[in-house]
């Protein structure tokens, strides 16, 4: 918010406070000043001058030679081509750039000649002085800026136009809507510099009459409009605002329009209370109804845009139609026009969340909506509407009808919190007396009654003792709070068991050449189709996002697989020949009610370790990564079993991961149809493992065995079996049949192709045999091998390969 420092002087003493000091102290007290700048910084050596004579240029049909009194001994001669400078302009006061003057944009003005006639400066238009439309009388918008006849001659133009002022640009946080006003910042300024602060109650004389004979107000949704205040002004005179008001509005970054609109903007800046003015004749039966909009209703707002309304929005209506979107913008059907004679001033308080939802839905963020969203004090509405009427009388812009319509359903009670000086000292690390704390709080409008802090209505952000303590710290000075070393006992942090397991799993993946990926928890329902899930699959039931970023982010995922395949596809599309990724992501399983996700119950969250790879690993190498993961986590009792029902995977190259017979995951080759939907070719591998189940299966005890004293004997075996026989089942048979001498068995080759009959495959294992107390003989090894081969032949019809 931009604020000219001179405006603060209406409410507090600013004498002796430099802009630099103001910037530093207000920022340290919590009201951050982004920038402080001088309004007239780019203007130098420009004064007011009175036109004494205007004659035609002898060698030009449009130039005029002027003599001007600029407060010096001799008049200054200036040649101008401005269309509004004529012999009739004699006596007018205007801005004059003297020799070696400067204008905004770095323009330098020096003496010169125009068509052979000396010109010792330049007469200025409002654009050349950096002013905007609305800051000057309409008659001066095309040509030289003429000033009021009472303007002194030879005066610095910066003082005349209100540019001899400093402006602070504040960054107001969302919890301090009271500081989005001159009065609010004046209160902060007075408290920070320990100066007096006062706000006069607006005084309205009125001209008689009774407002109730002109209009009525009905608030149907009091929860969305706690207070609605209105006054009527008749015999309105629409004209430019006085210079002092235009200058203040311009300094705050607001473009002046006319006196009535400017008054509403002025009061909003001064009090922080948005206002609106309706043309009374446009209100059917002089009636205002504050209600929810109806589906199908529409309104054209003051910016000329048509909007469709819904029943989630609050509207200001008359008997027939909406005339404003509450808290956002007025309607064009009740706009103040040049022929307006009677005006209704509205000053109301609207529910912040409703205004925010409405403004977002309509794509209309305004100065008013930005204030209402943060939560305003309902008690401001009365003072604001009276201040507007006071300004109307002060400017002679109309006649105020007696009476006020004030529909007040707001809570009349102050918020009260326990006053706990000792706790606040302990929290802040200070030793302030109770009297000191009370004094600091009272400067900000707080009161202490019966050991309670009475929170002022305008401080909607104060809810707890720590909030009150913060106010004490701000006024005491953050820079005065002594720095102290931490006095508590230092406790070494550690990872939780689940964090340790996740880090260990991630390490195994990285060591296996996998890169970590991270994806959104929001996906599109169409992704379930892409991974081949059946229409009746219960996993399709997902928690829906009410306000999604888009259709692709409309539900909470119940699987990470679509995100993994999408990331693999992204790499493949960018011609990356290989990619191996892992993600420790969360899935969200909803509570199902009547076949849908129950919106009143939060979904169950579960961590899933998902792996994906193409172009680098074979099926069995990928399986080896899973085995390494189980081994690193010290999980025993793990096994694998064929999985044919999972439609996302190839039915002949997919396995369930079991721990003590309970399924905790799946891995295998992605179904070619699914892979093709993602633009992937070749063998694409994936795995999905439940981290909670892995964590529960971790054996906390690790057993260490001494190094063997005797060597192992290694034997290889290759057999021919049907293609459908699972390698894991064969390995389990070998482990059981080979006896106690078997130390380990490892699958090292699976071959199908030349030399192998159709429907068959060659499977080769390496067996390691060892005895703890002796070196094994060939006979002992052969016996174990024969037992293993015999078991394979019996159970699977295996044929030993030569």
Question: Over which residues does each language-model region extend?
Answer:
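Extended, well-folded interaction surfaces typified by the phenylalanyl-tRNA synthetase beta subunit core
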Residues: 417-577, 715, 768-770, 780-802
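Phosphate-backbone binding interfaces of nucleic-acid-interacting proteins
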Residues: 1-209, 344, 363, 367, ...
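Terminal amphipathic helices with adjacent charged low-complexity linkers/tails
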Residues: 193-219, 396-424
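A carboxyl-terminal module marker
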Residues: 443-445, 519, 591-598, 604-605, ...
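Conserved mixed alpha/beta core segments that line enzyme active sites in large multi-domain catalysts
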Residues: 48-79, 258, 264-333
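Short, hydrophobic beta-strand segments
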Residues: 3-9, 165-173, 226-234, 367-374, ...
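Glycine/proline-enriched, intrinsically flexible loops and inter-domain linkers
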Residues: 24, 64, 193, 197-297, ...
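Mobile "lid/hinge" segments at catalytic clefts and subdomain interfaces of large enzymes
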Residues: 118-132, 139-145, 158, 313-413, ...
């Amino acid at each position: 918010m931009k604020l000219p420092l001179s405006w603060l002087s209406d409410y507090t003493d600013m004498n002796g406070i430099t802009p630099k000091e103001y910037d530093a102290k207000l920022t340290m007290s919590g009201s951050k000043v982004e920038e402080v700048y001088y309004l007239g910084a780019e203007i130098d050596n420009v004064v007011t001058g009175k036109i004494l004579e205007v004659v035609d240029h002898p060698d030009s049909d449009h130039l005029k030679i002027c003599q001007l009194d600029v407060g010096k001994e001799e008049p200054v001669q200036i040649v101008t081509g401005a269309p509004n400078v004529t012999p009739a302009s004699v006596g007018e006061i205007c801005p004059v750039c003297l020799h070696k003057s400067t204008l905004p944009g770095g323009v330098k003005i020096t003496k010169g000649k125009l068509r052979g006639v000396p010109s010792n400066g330049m007469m200025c238009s409002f654009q050349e002085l950096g002013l905007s439309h609305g800051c000057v009388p309409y008659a001066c918008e095309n040509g030289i800026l003429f000033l009021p006849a009472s303007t002194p001659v030879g005066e610095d133009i910066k003082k005349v136009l209100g540019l001899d002022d400093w402006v602070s640009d504040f960054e107001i946080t969302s919890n301090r809507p009271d500081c989005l006003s001159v009065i609010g910042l004046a209160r902060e300024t007075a408290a920070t510099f320990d100066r007096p602060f006062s706000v006069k109650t607006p005084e309205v004389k009125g001209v008689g009459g009774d407002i109730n004979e002109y209009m009525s107000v009905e608030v149907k949704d009091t929860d969305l409009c706690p207070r609605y205040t209105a006054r009527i002004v008749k015999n309105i005179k629409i004209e430019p605002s006085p210079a002092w008001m235009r200058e203040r509005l311009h300094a705050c970054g607001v473009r002046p329009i006319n006196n009535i609109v400017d008054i509403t903007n002025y009061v909003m800046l001064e009090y922080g209370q948005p206002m609106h003015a309706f043309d009374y004749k446009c209100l059917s039966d002089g009636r205002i109804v504050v209600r929810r909009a109806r589906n199908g209703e529409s309104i054209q707002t003051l910016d000329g845009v048509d909007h469709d309304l819904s029943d989630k929005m609050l509207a200001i209506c008359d008997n027939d139609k909406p005339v404003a979107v509450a808290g956002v913008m007025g309607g064009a059907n009740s706009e103040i026009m040049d022929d307006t004679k009677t005006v209704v001033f509205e000053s109301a308080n609207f529910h912040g969340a409703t205004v925010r939802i409405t403004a977002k839905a309509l794509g209309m963020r305004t100065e008013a909506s930005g204030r209402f969203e943060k939560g305003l004090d309902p008690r401001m509405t009365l003072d604001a509407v009276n201040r507007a009427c006071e300004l109307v009388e002060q400017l002679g812009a109309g006649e105020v009808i007696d009476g006020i319509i004030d529909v007040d359903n707001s809570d009349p009670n102050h918020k009260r919190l326990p006053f706990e000086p000792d706790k606040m000292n302990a929290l802040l690390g200070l030793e302030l007396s109770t009297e000191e704390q009370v004094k600091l709080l009272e400067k900000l409008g707080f009161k202490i009654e019966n050991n309670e802090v009475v929170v002022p209505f305008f401080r909607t952000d104060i809810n707890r003792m720590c909030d009150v303590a913060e106010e004490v710290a701000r006024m005491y000075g953050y820079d005065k709070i002594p720095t102290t070393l931490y006095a508590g006992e230092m406790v070494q942090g550690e990872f939780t068991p689940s964090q340790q397991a996740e880090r260990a799993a991630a390490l195994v993946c990285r060591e296996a050449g996998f890169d970590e990926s991270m994806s959104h928890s929001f996906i599109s329902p169409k992704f379930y189709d892409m991974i081949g899930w059946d229409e009746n699959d219960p996993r399709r039931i997902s928690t829906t996002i009410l306000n999604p970023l888009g259709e692709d982010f409309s539900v909470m995922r119940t699987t990470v697989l679509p995100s993994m395949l999408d990331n693999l596809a992204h790499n493949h599309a960018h011609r990356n020949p290989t990619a191996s990724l892992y993600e420790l992501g969360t899935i969200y399983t909803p509570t199902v009610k009547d076949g849908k996700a129950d919106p009143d119950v939060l979904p169950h969250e579960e961590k899933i370790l998902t792996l994906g790879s193409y172009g680098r690993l074979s099926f069995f190498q990928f399986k080896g990564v899973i085995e390494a993961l189980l081994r690193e986590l010290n999980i025993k009792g793990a096994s694998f079993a064929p999985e044919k029902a999972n439609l996302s995977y190839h039915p002949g190259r997919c396995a369930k991961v079991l721990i003590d017979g309970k399924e905790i995951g799946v891995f295998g080759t992605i179904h070619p149809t699914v892979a093709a939907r993602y633009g992937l070719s070749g063998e694409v591998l994936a795995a999905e493992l439940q981290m909670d189940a892995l964590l529960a299966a971790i054996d906390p005890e690790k057993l260490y065995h001494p190094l063997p004293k005797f060597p192992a004997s290694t034997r290889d075996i290759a057999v021919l079996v049907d293609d459908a026989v699972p390698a894991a089942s064969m390995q389990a048979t070998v482990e059981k049949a080979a006896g106690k001498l078997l130390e380990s068995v490892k699958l090292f080759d699976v071959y199908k192709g030349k030399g192998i009959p159709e429907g068959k495959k060659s499977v080769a294992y390496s067996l390691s045999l060892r005895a703890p107390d002796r070196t094994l003989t060939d006979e002992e090894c052969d016996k174990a091998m024969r037992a293993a081969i015999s078991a394979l032949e019996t159970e699977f019809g295996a044929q030993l390969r030569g």
